[in-house]
Amino acid sequence: MLKRNPISNNFIYFFGALGGLLFGYDTGVISGAMLFIGKELEIQTGSFEDGFITASVLLGAILGAAIIGPMSDKLGRKKLLLSAAIIFFVGALGSGIGFNYTLLVTSRVLLGIAVGAASALIPTYLAELSPADKRGGIGTLFQLMIMTGIFLAYVSNEWLSPSGWLGLNQNVGWHWMLGLAAVPAALLFIGG
């Protein structure tokens, strides 16, 4: 349990839970981006490649959660959370650049590894940092941030689509949709 003032504790809880926001954003944003990715990369809707772009995050998440659990007791949750933030950042940038199928899938697998790591690390990390009488509320912060991330993904999908608020070209908007996740990833690293 932390022995700092409440502002410092809240700061740590918020930044720790940013991994949940990234989890939600990275799993939700693909629904809007796929409408335009297929056109630019010439991938047929409903094809194996189309489905694999979406599923690659989940495959990475399985790997990330399986690997990070045993490592967290040896290396510490904070170090691994910072490592996950770096992986989130690299994966988001790679997805945003995504000029070909291989780069996009590889970047999304990296994002999945970070999602799996965050899922295994953050709830325990927040529980260890919080006082017993506030542990339940602070523990739900991770889940709240996942839902907030999904909501923000749908907002960005709307705003960055050709018919959306910013009206970006379909070959530009999806890159921004996926790449924007680098911002909270950088904040997670800085705040961690």
For each feature predicted by the language model, list its residue ranges.
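Transmembrane-helix signature of 12-pass secondary carriers
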Residues: M1-G192
